[in-house]
Amino acid sequence: MVKKVLVVEDHHDTSFLLCRLLKTEGYEVEHAIDGMVGFNAAESAPPDLIVTDIQMPRMDGIEMIKRIRGSKDISRTPIIVMSAYGKRLIDDALEAGADAFIEKPIDLDSFLATIKSKLPSV
């Protein structure tokens, strides 16, 4: 069964790279440009895992995580957070309910290993 990953990232180059990498690895991938679009996408078609940036327009990743954790249908979806902005944001994201944190710039091998470790088994 193909696993679905939702990538929530506002920077085009980063989202393009991550989506392409995940598709190459055999995942079904959906992309959202900010936390609001990401939350709505996750609610309407729940993914197996969410990868999100923290700092985005309209709704940031931390607010999106809080809403997901408060949502009945998607509250247990694993969430991996990406950011280049240091320890305070890492702590905020983990406190909000993120399951893992990846620093930018992203090491692609580490990224894929984290994805595989957080996806639920079938």
Stretches found by the model and what they are:
Residues 106-116:
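C-terminal output helix
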Residues 56:
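Receiver (REC) domain active-site loop signature in two-component systems and cognate sites
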Residues 45-51:
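Active-site beta3 strand of CheY-like receiver
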Residues 9:
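Conserved acidic carboxylate
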Residues 16-24:
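Charged docking surfaces used in two-component/phosphorelay signaling
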Residues 26-33, 41:
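Short hydrophobic/Thr-rich beta-strand motif most characteristic of the beta2 strand and flanking loop
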